[in-house]
Amino acid sequence: MNLRTPGGRGVRILPAALLLLAGAGILGAADDATTTALPADSATATSAPSQNDEIERLKAALAEQQKQLQTLQKTLENQQALLDKAMGSQSTGKTGTFTGIGQVASTTPIVPVAPLPAVAFPSPIARPRPQAAAGAPKNPCEAPPDTNAVPPYLRLGNVCIIPVGFMDLTPFWRDKNGASQMGSNFGSIPYNNAVNGNVSEYHFSVQNSRLGFRVDGDWQGTHFIGYNEFDFNGTGGATNYAVSNGAIVPRLRLFWIDARKGKIEFLAGQSWSMLVPNRKGISALPGDLFYSQVIDINYIAGLTWTRQPGLRVLFHPNSKVTFGIAAEQGDQYIGGSAGGSAITLPTAYAGLASTQLDQGQNVTLASYLGTPTPAPDFIAKIAFDPNSRLHIDLAGIETNFKTVNPTLLSQHFTKTGGGVELGINAEVIKNLRLISSNFWSDGAGRYLFGQAPDLIVRADGSLSTVHAGSTIEGVEARVKNTLLYGYYSGIYIGRNTAFDANGTTRIGYGYSGSPNSQNRDIQEITFGFNQTMWSNPRYGAINVMGQYEWLLREPWFVAAGAPKETHDNTIYFNVRYTLPGSMPNF
């Protein structure tokens, strides 16, 4: 029996067909009766009792067929009731396996998870969801589309695409003019004896807005992801940003491809460094990383991070352990970027800053990758996820440096540095997480947002790495539609000094008489909230956010009468609209 849609043509045709068959049976019986009643050439007329017997037999046949029709009608009604019940439970439950709002640029952990309700096309006829046929593709982007629901992703060929991004408006206030736009330059807070230390600032910014896309697919059992993300913190030559147009410049943040088959995973492109603490596994997806929940686009002092090109290979022995190795873009960094102070070079090697060592030259596009590097930075990492409430990762990094004596080209100087990072992210009680991230290095200070140099140069041209470390201790709590957070973090930069060739002039970092821009430590206390005001998987979400930030920095050397430290206060407020979209489960 082939039943079609409830209330459709198939259900109406079946009773009609049955009635037609019953009528044909009745007519056939009547024809038989008539034939029996007609006399043959050699027969005599049938007696009256014989005709009565035929009539009774016809009545009995009609009664039996009537019972059969009633039984069939009752069966149809029962099947109709079962279909109605099934459609009722389907329309009130969740459709799909998506988590709704959440896979949005780099704020996935910020947005509270919203369930995805059924999203059906208006239709007077309820249609059951088509069942997957035997041997149907496992790739949801190749499966037949569900004509009842509006999917939270786009289909292009055999891949799924979602937009990722949000639009931000961020008013912010600082009690000192850091001249650093929206992000904090942790290492260059003005001192109170400087003009900028006595001038406050208030600005509006949309620079943190982001646009991008994510592509998912499955080819012969290999699940691949392509991810792209831009913000508007790029640099440009125009000078009318605050005068007439506010023409901020897009900047590439992320652009990578990841492929996984079985236990092996491979990633290539520009991504967050594998040294960034994770929330889950060793995934490069922004929502699986920990870089705090703050509004400050430079995040928090002490976070180990960078976004740079590289390659990585991951091995998943099981669902609870991941091991990875990566080769990422190296840099012979001696300070001078993002508010970090540069080292003092020996006189004979002062030219290295513009030819062989990076003293902030790699900040602008004109000199991007202008500084040579002998090898990539190599990173190894292992992550443990025994359950959804606990994540632990341990990472190690190797850095390599090489210079040439500009007056004696046959003389080379090399040095190897490294560091270790330990991160813990634990949900101690429901909706309350404690976070700890700790880093110690000897020649990897660049990964602390450039606040520490990697190395110094001695008078003879030899290289010496600089100790640098950091810590982050924080808490994150979710109360209904609001995320609350608070962090303490800090950076320590070790002293590494030497004498110049004259034997009296000090060089390096943190020496007696060094500029007060050469910091010994930077500390931060910050807290804030992120509240989801409205969320709909078909339209996106609106969030309001707030953050307070207190920063302190202390130099290695304090001249007579000079301030021993400086600090500032910053208040951020943010209104965000997040684009809708989420990927199906593969």
Residue ranges and their predicted role:
Residues 156, 202-208, 245-252, 302-306, ...:
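Transmembrane beta-barrel outer-membrane domains
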Residues 169-175, 230-236, 272-274, 327-331, ...:
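Transmembrane beta-strands of outer-membrane beta-barrel pores
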Residues 384-527:
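Detector for outer-membrane/organellar transmembrane beta-barrel domains
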Residues 128, 143, 148-188, 193-341, ...:
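Outer membrane beta-barrel
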Residues 27-180:
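N-terminal periplasmic/intermembrane-space "pro-region" immediately following the signal or transit peptide
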Residues 2-15:
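Bacterial N-terminal signal peptides that target proteins for export
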Residues 566-586:
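Outer-membrane beta-barrel "beta-signal"
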Residues 90, 97, 106-124, 181-198, ...:
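Solvent-exposed loop segments that connect transmembrane elements
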